[in-house]
Amino acid sequence: MAQYDVLIVGAGHGGAQAAVALRQNKFEGTIAIVGDEPELPYERPPLSKEYFSGEKSFDRILIRPATFWAERNVDMLLGKRVASVDPAGHSVTLTDGSTIGYGKLVWATGGAPRKLACSGHHLSGVHGVRTREDADRMLGEMERTTSVVVIGGGYIGLEAAAVLSKAGKKVTVLEALDRVLARVAGEALSRFYEAEHRAHGVDVQLGAKVDCIVGDDQDRVTGVQMHDGSVIPADMVIVGIGIIPAVEPLIAAGAAGGNGVDVDEYCRTSLPDIYAIGDCAMHANAFAEGARIRLESVQNANDQATTAAKHILGGTDAYHAVPWFWSNQYDLRLQTMGLSIGYDETIVRGDPANRSFSVVYLKNGRVLALDCVNAVKDYVQGKALVTGGVSPDKASLANPEIPLKTLLPA
């Protein structure tokens, strides 16, 4: 049986950063990363943006080249999947039947694309957006595709819609709620992006009720049937309605959890010597007033990886990173700082018509978060307002001529 001092399951941002952080902090033990894809760790956000549009080749989205891992003695066990975990025996069993022992286990598996509760997912031309294989399959179909239906008006769906619209495709976005980005942003930002997509020719349908995905006798997708019986024609369907955390082996082994696996402030699960990080980790977040949440972001994956690595090495620094996120759509660069969970007021700073503005989220007058569209200065200067829990003058906050840094307490 192979044996590693630290075994990392998941070859995404979190898994890669865990290995990097261990070596950066002078860990000299053996490390291996198990990944279910054949590729080296790569950046996932570009799959619905720069890689999908052809702006970046795959080599340019690798987190590190092969030589980096070899030079740091990190073994890459790629194209392999963990089937079960034995906490008592400190080992995992792969789907091929082989067993690997560990001293510490870091679970960084992210999640699998959530599917609609309807038929048609098996049809050729229906895609999720999680892996390079997903993106390559879509790219391979682009030439013969004229019309696309995107199910889900979140960031992944809207980013894909922007790329497809720019490529000249007829795009329809179906969102079940009454606005796009409803789960992650306030109404001002939602309406702005809805208008932008409509201006680029995207048909945005809100309150949309999908009945099923339909296809021909060759099992090729032909459209999406709505609850009223109408069918929206499509050569391609992209489903972007969130993920299901990939934690089944840990839960089966006895780890506490449900919507992900529960971790403490050091990213430890309830099982001995097992950590969980990134999209699959349910944690108490100070920027959500201590609520237990999962964060699906590169920032969270990387920062939790560093927290876990340092704790493995005996550190006592708890996870307390300010959340941030970004999205590129058309020529719009959205940058978010903090979490808007529980906000009771928003202030729009600047004019959305100028395509450069910020939305500030407040609770009891205190700044929780900012969404900054083509407003880098607000994003950079707003971090201190979020981390400091500042309650600035609202008129000054709404005035884009007043730099945010001047609103900090003296």
From Swiss-Prot:
InterPro entries per UniProt: FAD-oxidoreductase/Apoptosis, FAD/NAD-bd_sf, FAD/NAD-binding_dom, FAD/NAD-linked_Rdtase_dimer_sf, Reductase_C
Enzyme class, UniProt record, top EC level: oxidoreductase
Any GO MF annotation of the entry: ferredoxin-NAD+ reductase activity
Domain of life, source organism: Bacteria
Binding site for FAD: G14, D36, K49, V82, R130, D279, V298
Key words of the record: FAD, Flavoprotein, NAD, Oxidoreductase
Reactions it catalyzes: 2 reduced [2Fe-2S]-[ferredoxin] + NAD(+) + H(+) = 2 oxidized [2Fe-2S]-[ferredoxin] + NADH
Chain segments annotated as coiled-coil in the UniProt record: none
Cofactor: FAD
Gene3D superfamilies: 3.30.390.30, FAD/NAD(P)-binding domain
GO cellular component: cytoplasm
EC number: 1.18.1.3
Record text on subunit structure and interactions: The chloroacetanilide N-alkylformylase multicomponent enzyme system is composed of an oxygenase component (CndA) and an electron transfer component formed by a ferredoxin reductase (CndC1) and a ferredoxin (CndB1). In vitro, chloroacetanilide N-alkylformylase assays in which CndB1 is substituted for CndB2 demonstrate that the two enzymes possess nearly identical activities.
Homology family: Belongs to the FAD-dependent oxidoreductase family.
Function description: Component of the chloroacetanilide N-alkylformylase multicomponent enzyme system involved in the degradation of chloroacetanilide herbicides (N-alkoxyalkyl-N-chloroacetyl-substituted aniline derivatives). In vitro, catalyzes the transfers of electrons from ferredoxin (CndB1) to NADH. N-dealkylase utilizes NADH, but not NADPH, as the electron donor.
Name of the protein described by the UniProt record: Chloroacetanilide N-alkylformylase, ferredoxin reductase component
